[in-house]
Amino acid sequence: MNPVVVVHGGGASNISKDRKERVRQGILRAATVGYNILKQGGSAVDAVEGAVTVLEDDPDFNAGCGSVLNENGEVEMDASIMNGKDLSAGAVSAVRCIANPIKLARLVMDKTPHCFLTDQGAARFAAANGIPTIPGQQLVTERSRKRLEKEKLEKDAQKPDCQKNLGTVGAVALDCQGNLAYATSTGGIVNKMPGRVGDTPCVGSGGYADNDIGAVSTTGHGESILKVNLARLALFHVEQGKSLEEAANASLGHMKSKVKGVGGIIMVNKAGEWAVKWTSTSMPWAAAKDGKLHSGIDFGDTSIIDLS
């Protein structure tokens, strides 16, 4: 089985010119890390965790050290991961003072009988398992501060925009043994209420993986994704015989027509076919397969380079 990894850097209304190349390079790094793990015999779960960790460590993405701020100016993060081999899953929400929530979600999957831990329970579990904590302000970037200030001003001016605040990062993978996995991580939406949880940590919404069907990671307006169970909906369409592209388009179209939500999907199936689709203005993505690295940000913007 030829391994495949696909990553995304979140749906976006726009990416400024000064950030676009940094975002592209970040996505390429994440896909390359995930692909190298697979080529060295690592599992799909290892690959998606590794790829998402790269993006959590990159301040240009809304996850980990680049997370947006809640209305109190604090970082609260969500993440989830799933193994398509046995449907085991791990998720965390509203976690603070941790650089890599996806690593904590992996531990929930591997070391507890549960699927989901939140807030103080997640924090105590992290401490008990040696996950290092960092000062909360160390996760706050100047860009995040400015975004919060701008959002508060626009909220006061009553200028809602369903395309804003869509950032999430995610990965899906197929390993050499034919196993599938997904991982998704986010800082949520700018100026959210403390304790708000979106789609990202919710299995079936923020992602899903089943060796018999495929793996999905989603991005977009979290409340909209939750209402339609976007990830599992996409795989339902695959089960009904649709191609990955048809399934992604149908699911995103349903979300847009039912709740006016926009977002994006990355998918890979058990045959190693992959797809990326979005209805937001842009979505940074990269896919590695057969020694080739495909990537793009905007509609019609696709490049392919050799991995050597």
Curated annotation (Swiss-Prot):
Keyword Cell inner membrane on entry: no
EC number(s) stated in the UniProt entry for this protein: 3.4.19.5, 3.5.1.1
Keywords assigned by UniProt, alphabetized: Acetylation, Autocatalytic cleavage, Cytoplasm, Hydrolase, Protease
Compartments, as annotated in UniProt: Cytoplasm
Gene Ontology terms for molecular function: asparaginase activity; beta-aspartyl-peptidase activity
Reaction(s) the record says it catalyses: L-asparagine + H2O = L-aspartate + NH4(+); Cleavage of a beta-linked Asp residue from the N-terminus of a polypeptide
GO cellular component: cytoplasm; photoreceptor inner segment
Mod. after translation: Cleaved into an alpha and beta chain by autocatalysis; this activates the enzyme. The N-terminal residue of the beta subunit is responsible for the nucleophile hydrolase activity.
Residue positions of the active site: T168
Biological processes per GO annotation: asparagine catabolic process via L-aspartate; proteolysis
Residues recorded as bearing N-acetylmethionine in the entry: M1
Binding site for substrate: R196, V197, G198, D199, T219, G220, H221, G222
Cystine bridges: none
Record-linked PANTHER family: ISOASPARTYL PEPTIDASE_L-ASPARAGINASE, L-ASPARAGINASE
Subunit structure: Heterodimer of an alpha and beta chain produced by autocleavage. This heterodimer may then dimerize in turn, giving rise to a heterotetramer.
Its biological purpose: Has both L-asparaginase and beta-aspartyl peptidase activity. May be involved in the production of L-aspartate, which can act as an excitatory neurotransmitter in some brain regions. Is highly active with L-Asp beta-methyl ester. Besides, has catalytic activity toward beta-aspartyl dipeptides and their methyl esters, including beta-L-Asp-L-Phe, beta-L-Asp-L-Phe methyl ester (aspartame), beta-L-Asp-L-Ala, beta-L-Asp-L-Leu and beta-L-Asp-L-Lys. Does not have aspartylglucosaminidase activity and is inactive toward GlcNAc-L-Asn. Likewise, has no activity toward glutamine.
Protein's UniProt name: Isoaspartyl peptidase/L-asparaginase
Organism field: Bos taurus (Bovine)
